[in-house]
Amino acid sequence: MWRRRALPAAALAVALLAATGCDGGTTDATPRPTTAPSKPPTSVARVCAKPAAGPAKAPAGAVTVDPAVPGDLAAKTGSSPPHTTFWLRPGRHTLLTDRYDQVIPKEGNVYVGAPGAVLDGRESNHYAFGGAAPDVTIRHLTVRGFVAPRDEGVVNHDSADGWVIEHAMIRDNSGAGLMAGARQQVRASCLRDNGQYGMNAYKDGDLSGLVVEGNEITGNNTDDWERQRPQCGCSGGVKFWAVNGADVRGNWVHGNHGTGLWADTNNNDFLIEGNLIEDNAGAALIYEISYNAVVRNNTIRRNDWVDGRASAAGGDTFPFATVYLSESGGEPRIRARTDKIEVYRNVLENNWSGITLWENADRFCNSPANTSSGDCTLLVKDTGRCVRPAIAEAPLYSDCRWKTQRVDIHENRFVLDKSVVGCTARCGHMAVLSNYGTYPDWSPYQGERVAEAITGGQHNRWHDNVYVGPWTFVVHDASRTVGVKQWRGTPYRQDAGSAFRAGDGD
C-alpha cells in the first residue's frame, strides 16, 4: 500500500538534473502570517519508562489469578460469567503450551494487573487475548513475548468492538502488539518494540469511533518488514485501515523503524492533534487513499532521515515527505467533522522534507496499478462500473479516482537546518505533483490530466505559514523544482501571506 509513481524515462532524466535538494531556492519575503503557529505540545506521553502502577490489592469482587499456575487466567476466564473482573497477582503469568492457547474474554470482562504483573507468551503462544466479546477492558498489564504472524495481533486478536486498553505495556511481540475494533479506546499505554506494528487498526467489518490518546508508541517494526517485503507498506507505529472516525491525540510517536502513523485505504474523519512525532525512520504521517482529516497542533521533528537518505543515495527523485498525503482529500459527500484535509498550527522541524501532496494518475478503481487490490473509492459502491465507456464520463470520471483535493495547509512553522539533518541533495521540499498517466491502456487519466488537476484544479492551498531555511518546491511532476518566487507567482499562487527566511534555521 505505497506511493508509486511511474515516470517515463525522459522525465526521470530531467528530474535527475533538476533536483536541487536542500540548497538554494528561498528568498526573504515581507508578508507575515495572520496567525502565529501554535507552540509544541507542553507534555509528552512518557509512558514506557514510568507506567502507572495497578492496584496492589484485588478490587472488590475480583477473581484473583495466580502466576504460579500455568493457564490460570484462561481457565478462570472460561469458568467465570461475563462482566467479571480479574486481578492478576504480581509475577509472570503464562498460558498453556499450545501455540493457539489464549485468553477468550466474555462480554464486559475487566483484566487488571497488580504492580509487576506480566502475561508472557514465552516466544511460543501466538495470541494473548482474542475472541469476539465486546466491551472488554485491560488495565495495568504488561503483555510480552507473543509471536503473532505478520498482519495479525496479540491483544484483541479478532478485532472485537468496544475494548478499552489503559495503562498497559504491550511490548516485544511479533506481528502487531494490538488490533482494533469499533469504539476501541487505547489510552496511556506503551506500544513498544513490536515486530511489525504497535497497533494494526484493521477489522473485517465496520471500524469506527477509534480513540488513541496519550500513548507512547516507539521502536516498532523490529522485524524490518519493509526490507523483508520491499514496498509492502506493512510496518510502522500504527497502521489504520478503513477506519471511519478516529481521534489520535496527545501521543508520543518516536523511534519507529518506518512510518510513525499510517492511514491507508478509505479512512475518513480523522483528528490528529497534539502529538509529538519524532525520530521515526520514515514519514511521520502518511494519509493514503483516504478522506477528510484535521491535522493540527502537532510537533513533528527529525523524521524520515533514514528512508529519505537511502532514497536520495539511490538516485530516487521522488520528493519523499514527512507528512505524505497520497490520493487523499476532502470530500463533502462523505460525512465527517470537516470536508477538507486541514493541516494547521503544526511545527515541522528538521525533518528530511516537508509536506507532499501526491496523486498517482494510474491508481484508480479496477486499475492494476491500484495496490489496494479490490478496493474502490467510498463514492462508488459497485466497482464493476469503473470501466470503459462509463469511467470516461461524469460522474464516474471523478468518482472512480481517489483525489488529492481540498487540502488546506496554513499557520504552520516549517524549519530546516540542513547541517542538522545532514542532507546534501533531494531534501527540504514541499510538493504537489502527479506522474504522467500511462496505464492501463483503457485509462481515461492518461497524459498530464491528473498533474494539471492536482496542481491547479483541485483546491489545494498553502497559505499563512512561516518558513525558516532553504526550502524548495516540487510542482506538477517530479522534474519541476521551483523557488519561493515561482511558487508564489503565476500559475501556482501558493503561500499567500506566508513568511520566508532563508538560511539554515534558528
Task: Report residues per predicted region.
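Short, flexible, solvent-exposed loop/turn segments with mixed acidic/basic and small polar residues
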Residues: 8, 19, 54
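Intrinsically disordered, low-complexity sequence elements enriched in Ser/Thr/Gly/Pro
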Residues: 1-3, 30-31, 499
